[in-house]
């Protein structure tokens, strides 16, 4: 019999009836995972060159969040006021249909709305890398102090609390100057724009306008300054030549390695250089358009592989083991750190790709002249991108393994090695060996380390006697219930408030123990680089004495990280410090009169504690408050800075502590 005919309505009803059990209703208001925004991979000038135009415009993939025009989101607030032009630019609405429908506004040097989109995309991408590597939410540097409510009920003597800063402010057109900088007092990024010099260089338009906010290198660099200052607010205190250099170098490292997240760009450059990273390519250069627009510049602002010589010719950088000892300018010294990390990256890349090169070269190890296979390019680029991602996360994760003040490059090497051992106990791919080789090649060595083995470079585990172990157990018992509560919090402001209250309570807890005058507590604190007694120092035959230094608890944060091999790492970070203040009489060079100034000398420790067993202390990373060696080194360095004949006294910040770094002055380009 022929099949029975049914009406369309009956058929629809039949379909609905039989599919009811398997039909899954979808929420059409489901929030997307990511927001896609177009932007530049390199400086805008590369979009006007045939060789790079196809790879310079990329799509930034950042976590979705609710934003209002600006953009204004959970972490950032873009405020586009141009004081020099007396203009206020309309804020971009990233949720408008026209913007969403085309993955963001079209990249444009002349559209302020795109400028706002660009800075938002790059800074959010940078934040995402930090939060993934550190295993916790980012909280910006505090702005000011105010009263804690109900301080008496909480049992706190210190009634002051640091103010929560919800958003980092970004000003794309803040100044008409060849500068861009992070302002720690405003907790803001200020980007400038300026007129390029009249000489013809690269893709620049002589006399044209250069916007620093359109350089992803500059934006990522400044964002990293803000993040690093939020994680380690003592790293702006200029106590050693490495401090300012570390801020500069680390910010460049993040900007440089983030480039390797753009696979098409990496493939393009490797195809151009026959798969070699030690030849000239744009992957190892930062802020090219910015650098070429300045008077007497000959290329990128900074390069990790090579640089232009006086004749304008590009030459490869070769490691010099004596350069570190003889370089004192923060930019040049920071460039050494960048070159060291990029050297480790190149070593890893060569090591990981040698099998591919052998196969492609029939065992000779030398590829034939001409273009290499597109398949080989893709394989090489995949290795380069994977190595860069791992190395970037190692560099970021190491920040949690640094001492709280007076950072030196040797400390950072130990932090890198220790952080990676925790993340990947077996170094199958040679990351730690490559880092050690690169630091050794440039003469950068830690203090008081006998060998450069990974075992020697790993921060030591604490050695407590029975009584000291009991004292730490007492401290851990105080922390445990509160840390468990902190770990359950999701909202950033609540994390900030609760962690600072806990920090204040821990500070009071330790102070009471110190006031008790117990020798056991002094012995225990000495293992943490702290003291319960007055501090005495001698420098240049002058003695300095101060009462028991002020104790501060800077951080108590749980961290939940994922290592290279998928290993889960759960830890609690506790950062303690003390400040010794020594008065001394100095002559005012302007008036010739004697004045009293205060020498600040800090010490302290980063405690890394197992989250699963809070009474298990994994590392004590300290700078001893009673170290005469460190005190003497700091005094010598800061006195040399005050000698204008050395040309180093350019980084004091005016109204703040005269030994604090000024990022505005640090980044000034005449």
Where are the predicted features?
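Zinc-dependent metallohydrolase catalytic domains
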Residues: 116, 123, 127-141, 152-188, ...
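Active-site pocket-lining segments that scaffold enzyme catalytic pockets across diverse folds
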Residues: 147-148
